[in-house]
């Protein structure tokens, strides 16, 4: 990481504000079905991570995050997926500084809406292709992107988890693609609806 300073000056040239920010440089490519990071093949050894503490439940603190980073590094884990929602903001700074790659997941999970007694039955799948859900879905994607777009550790955007597939999730994919920020986009439930497997996410080929 590199330390950058943005200076804001008044009309008379006097210094009004200084904003420090740690930045990094990265280039992600897929060449012959292999992911490269800054020109070198990327081998991912990653885990899903929930924000959880055995005593405080879903309310975790900075020390919990530091312990998780330490655990990842001790076990040679180089990447983490923020399942199944965006994490607290400090977590992304910690991943930046520790060199942990991040799949930043959008806050979307609705697996109960397309399963009936364990079977796949998507007649009431939400958000699916219902037009009344599109705005809310895109808003969640936008919130994820705009909040965390400047974090070098983020290599992937995730559209969510276990929410079947449909026009609305496809629209999320288009939203991230139009940003052209060089990151890859992933979604793990496209296989439930093969009509969208080529327009949402590629799960099965070996990149």
Label each PLM-derived region with a short phrase.
Residues 1-94, 98-102, 140, 155-156, ...:
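Secreted/periplasmic carbohydrate-active enzymes, especially glycoside hydrolases
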Residues 70, 79-207:
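Substrate-binding/catalytic cleft of secreted carbohydrate-active enzymes
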